[in-house]
Amino acid sequence: DIDTLLLDKTGTITIGNRKATHFHTAPGIDLHAFVENCLLSSLSDETPEGKSIVELGRESGIRMRSLNTTGARMIKFTAETKCSGVDLPDGTQIRKGAFDAIRKIVETAGNKFPEEVEKVIAAISSNGGTPLVVCVNRKVTGVIELQDIIKPGIQERFERLRKMGVKTVMVTGDNPLTAKYIAEKAGVDDFIAEAKPEDKMEYIKKEQQSGKLVAMMG
């Protein structure tokens, strides 16, 4: 019988369809201009997240016709850079991505990462959301909040496994605050945050060394 079950968060514990729910601006940044920049960087983004950013922007009253992407160069998301965006013909560079990735871009350029924005990021994360940080010309302009939905009935399933003596472990690329919130909501016993494939292997090895039989799902 298995002792430990590792589960991928996305699609197994959550529905896996993260949606943009809020635009949060950095101090002194105009909301309308911020939303336009978010949309410009998402227009050719085919991911569910990208499409939901465009959708939320439309609902915020942004006229799509006023967005000009002629001659723009789209920057695709990669696992290495952890961000995506657009380079506009006038030299404007817009990037959106993970907190650590954008912080690196901003601080490498000698700019400060606003404390107020860090607070917003912490609040989104501890509420189970995913913060996508946006910067324009290497200066932070705000955060897009994404939310994922935990599958109904998942807590009961984990409760049953617990009674059978199975330890459940959620594996996610989310930051530790978001991971902790979702792990608690879903009712798993443990979690691996900001997980890379080698972290998963490391955890499995550790469990096996203590004589546990480990299975993986998702």
Model-based region annotation:
Residues 1-13, 18-218:
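Cytosolic catalytic headpiece
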